[in-house]
Structures are given as structure tokens and as C-alpha cells.
Amino acid sequence: MAEEGKGGYSEHDDRVVGRGFSGRRKKGRGPFRGKMYSEMNRNSRNRGGTGPSSSRQRQDEDDGDVAMSDAHDAPRGRYLPYGPRPSRAPHLTVRRDLPPPDRSGGGSRDGGRRNWFKITIPYGKKYDKTWLLSSIQNLCSVPFTPVEFHYDHNRAQFYVEDATTASALKQVSRKITDRDNYKVVIIINSSAPPPSLQNELKPEEIEQLKVCMSKRYDGAQRALDLKGLRVDPDLVSQSIDVVLNQRSCMMVVLRIIEENIPELQSLNLSSNKLYRLDDLAELAIKAAGLKVLDLSRNELKSERELDKVKGLKLEELWLDGNPLCDGFRDQSSYISSVRERFPKLLRLDGHELPPPIAFDVEAPVTLPPCKGSYFGSDDLKVLVLRFLQQYYSIYDSSDRQGLLDAYHDGACCSLSIPFGPQNPPRNTLNEYFKDSRNVKKLKDPTMRFKLLKHTRLNVVAFLNELPRTQHDVSSFVVDVCAQTNTLLCFAVHGIFKEVDGKSRDSVRAFTRMFIAVPAGNTGLCIVNDKLFVRNATADELRKAFVMPAPTPSSSPVPSLAAEQQEMLAAFAMQSGMNLEWSQKCLQDNDWDYGRAGQVFTQLKLEGKIPEVAFLK
């Protein structure tokens, strides 16, 4: 349910350590289970309804809903940051009873006009498509044809073609009641044509576009002028329709820039009816040296659109002629808002800006390397490492049911995927996204509760559904965060790879936070488990699986020849490693004692042998 994007981590914000613990105790059935040292009371939970609260519905309805009458408000007397350029057209008052202007580029050059609207139903994913559309149609005053009905995260969305239909649909909002007695909210937004209706440029048209762009490129200034590209005479004469507020066309233009003029420093996109900047988000990657950007005389309504391109290191920006300029009370607030996104900006709308307020900062220093594991004491080190070795030997096996012994009856567990610009596309983590409980993105309280796994049976059933893995125990870094007589909190960070399915051999990084209580005399029992998963960085990939962990086995030391047993005992004594890891080292070196010793010494000097290898 969570979206791509910058990194926010989930947290168990609605529970405490002892919640839901059962008074029932099971006798130990292995290394994990045993009698608890402490009892914790069951806390009641007010589960509430299954739908959103009324305040949340009002927020969703108000956010982004637009009037059907027009796309521009009448003059409001607000401060216009800078005067118009000499060639700027006079301001016209638009009547509120007129249809909104065509900004989608969906019409033809001969004056034909098609206005599209996106219809959004918050939390619509919980409704059946047939029931939802028929319920809306029964109350809508005009018949409508939904185009491209789909679910986007927890929302249902589709498109309609004209303002009359959109207005009629708006009247249906809150008139439908679902079986949970919640009102169905309908939000209307003006939109570009649906993606399936946006014309893709043909290969020969793309070649002509390249020729057109080459004529508009000034190599000496490294400047590309795409002002009013749709009405370029060369393109019009060949009936090539390049509409830059359509994603397909903008992507072609950005690809041409990336492949031919990545050194671009100045780009003019004025007079192209741009009303959003989502499609320019990759510009900072494709033209990293861009310093001048002209977005004047477009239809940008909010300064928040600039957030989508704030990765650019701009020195000059043009925004005059956009509706967003009318929303500032004075010049200083306008400059401040823009400079917040582009701190190195020197000129705005052709005007020199006052120098930015800067503070003396120390010269950059190299951060110290991350330290290794922290346990607090040798006793805790032995306890935690033994627990992790047992836990992940089962977790990496073909059957994770053995983890039932590791969890308390009232345990809680959740999974979260961080979001951020540096993260790869979400499809590389598809098996995890459906269960992600990232509270920065997931606002629906019902889904937050649903994605929180309660009781050890549900926790282990959930873990069994996750992809099969092999963890690189040599990558583990463990930090003991808190310790009392009845509770232990520790985090483990490391690397694993998937061993089957579509993402086989994909390497992931993880951080796992365990809260555990004593079990038996020497064991631990998990009451709270938070798992964070992301794709491994290039540096993590380079270091991963340098010394593979031994394959989990029910018999750690299989039958060996007498000579091999003597060699194994001697190697374990000299290296200090346990028998399992000593045998692994000898086998990897074909039982060549001398070579195994050299490899061990080298890996130990490099810090690549995990601490569990020395746990006996």
C-alpha cells in the first residue's frame, strides 16, 4: 500500500512492548522457548471502524478538488512579484460560468477541444468495480463512460471527457453509503488525456523532432529554445503534434537531450501549457549541468510543482506568466519560496536577486567509518549471537515453521520499505511492497492496523510468505539498544539475497529491530519484530557474500575420515572458530591445512569473518 518515493521508515506507533501478551505459557520446545521471567497485562485496543474517519474524508475531498466552471480564479488583488515582460499579453478576467481552458493538449490545432477530468474515489480499492460504478451511475444525472478505470494504491480512479459529466459526478459525492456506513467521496480534477489516448510519436516523427531541436540549439551558449514547440513551423508543416504537457512527448524530448546534448546549460520551455512538472523530474539526471530554466507563460498553479525539479542546481529561473505568481503577498515571500527550492539562484524572472544569507561552515570532513557491533557485555554477546545463529538458520531454511518457538504468543511484527529518490523502481521489491507499513506514506488507519501482524501464529505465517533467502551472516552488525532484567532490545543490520522466484539472486539490505524477553534459562523470546528491507547499495553489493555462511544442516559436523577429524580439531583449536566454521574453511580449501590457514588469517585481518564463527 505504500508509494515510491524518499525514504521514510515505518514505526510501530500504535503499540507497546507488552500489548496483547497471553497469560498462557508453553513449555520449552527447543532453544527459543521457555518460561517467561515476567508477566505483562493484555491491553485493550479500540479497533474502530473499517473505513476512514470523517475528518480524513473531508481532508481528501478538499485536497485537489477543483471547480467545474473554470481553471482560473478572478483577480484577487494579490501581489504580482514582478511586472510583465514587454510582450506579455494583458490580463483577462475569466467568467466562472465558462468551461475550463484546454491545457491538456488533447484538442486539435484547428480549434477542436476535449476537456478531460480525473475522477478519484479515496479508499476506493475496498470496493468492487461493478458495484462502485453502478452505484455512481444510478445517482448521476447524466450517463457517463468511465475511461481507464484502475486502482492506484488505496484509491479508485477513472477519466471522463467533458465538464458536464464531471459536474454531474461531483454532485454524487457523499450520496452513496457503503456497507460500513461510510459516505463514498468523489473528487474531481482537471487532467491531461488518459495515457492510452495520448499519441505516441512514431520513429520518423522523432527523427524530425531531432532535426527541429538541433535548429533550436545554440552550441556556443549550450542553450536549447523549446518555446511554443507545438506551433513550430517545421513540425506543423509535417503534421507532427508535439505536446510537451503530455508525458509521452516530454519523455522523448528528455531522451533526445540525454543522448545528444547532456552538457545542456540553458533550457527554455515557456509557452507550452505546462500545468505540472512531474515529467521533468528526471531533468536533473539527464542534464545535470543545467543552470538556466525558463518556465514562463505556462499554467503552473502552485509553487509546490517546483519541488519536483528542485534537484536542479539553477542559477536563473523564469516563472512569470504562471498562475502561481498571483499567490504571493509580496516580492520577498515570492523570492523566499523559490529560493527555498533553489538556494543557489541568482536571477528570478530576469531580476538580480539579493545575495542569499549564508553562514560560515567548516571545511568538509570525512565521516569516520561505522563501528562494528555493540553488545555491552560478553554475556549479552554470547546470548544474542547464539540467538541470531539459531534464528537465521531456520529463517533461511525451506520451512520457517520452526520460528514458532522464537515468538511470544502475543508477538507483533511489521515490514516497511523506505522511500526516496535514490531508491530503485518499486517493481524490484514487489514481493515486499504489498505488506509495507510505511506510516509516512500509509495514512489509512485501517490499513495500518491490518498490516500489523499480531500473535505468533500470524507472525510466522506472514514470514513464511516472504521470499526464500540466504543471509550473509558475515555482514551482520548488531547493536544492543536497551537491557533490563526482563527485556532486551537489539537491532541487526546486514545483507541477504533471494534464492528463488523472479528476483532470484537479488541482493537486499535489511535492518531488523527485535524486542525480546527471557525464555528458559538461556534463551530469548521475541515480543516485537520490525523488519526494514531495501535494495543493497553498490558498496554493499561489493562486500556481500565474500565468505558465504555454512548451509544450514541438521547435522553440523557430518561423518569425516579419522584424518579429517584430527585436522578439523587442530584447525578449530588454532583458529578459535567453532567446528562448523572450521570445517567450512577446510572444505573450501580442499582440506589443504596450510592454504586454509592463510585464507583464515587474511579474512580475519580484513574483518570479514563473522563473530558467530567464534561462538561455541
Curated annotation (Swiss-Prot):
Ranges of biased composition (kind: Polar residues)? 40-56
Q: Where is the signal peptide?
A: none
UniProt xrefs under PROSITE patterns = LRR, NTF2_DOMAIN, TAP_C
Compartments, record wording? Nucleus, Nucleoplasm; Nucleus speckle; Cytoplasm; Nucleus
GO cellular component annotations, sorted alphabetically?
cytoplasm; nuclear speck; nucleus
Q: What does this protein do?
A: Involved in the nuclear export of mRNA from the nucleus to the cytoplasm.
Which PANTHER family does the record associate with it? NUCLEAR RNA EXPORT FACTOR, NUCLEAR RNA EXPORT FACTOR 1
Name the chain's protein. Nuclear RNA export factor 1
